[in-house]
């Protein structure tokens, strides 16, 4: 089961490292992306779900709850009491959560239809809500714990 933790912005990697030091299976998926700064395109690494960390666990015991809750940077678990992602959402997000190194997606547009040839979004064209050719970015639609969200900068 996957539990979602809300953390301080910019502290995702610190929280993941601290939880892994305590033998807790935690991760915060990031991906490579092209950004233009000063007229030059650069490859940068960005969080897919900023301020969220995911924890794999068979259940939440009191010991696990307080170990995670007392970690520096953790604000709270999503859900009261902490509830795992429903299986339907877990299955939909598994393609992002299972991959360690998410690379830049590349593709083309033909007659207004986006086709991805390589990278994170290959085979996921149906999730794309909009595409910016100038910024070289796609926006995806997904749900996390019943809350609809659009993932930008992918």
Locate the predicted segments by residue:
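Acidic-enriched and Gly/Ser
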Residues: 1-113, 128-154
């Amino acid at each position: 089961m996957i539990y979602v933790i809300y953390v301080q912005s910019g502290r995702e990697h610190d929280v993941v490292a601290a939880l892994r030091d305590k033998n807790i299976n935690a991760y915060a998926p990031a991906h490579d992306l092209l950004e233009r700064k000063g007229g030059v395109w650069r490859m940068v690494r960005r969080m897919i779900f900023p301020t969220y960390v995911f924890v794999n666990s068979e259940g939440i015991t009191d010991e696990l709850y307080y170990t995670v809750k007392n970690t520096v940077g953790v604000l709270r678990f999503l859900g009261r009491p902490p509830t795992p992602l429903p299986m339907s959402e877990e299955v939909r997000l598994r393609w992002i959560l299972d991959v360690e190194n998410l690379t830049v997606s590349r593709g083309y547009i033909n007659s207004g239809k986006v086709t991805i040839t390589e990278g994170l979004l290959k085979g996921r064209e149906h999730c794309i809500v909009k595409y910016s050719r100038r910024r070289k970015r796609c926006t995806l639609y997904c749900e996390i714990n019943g809350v609809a969200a659009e993932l930008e900068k992918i």
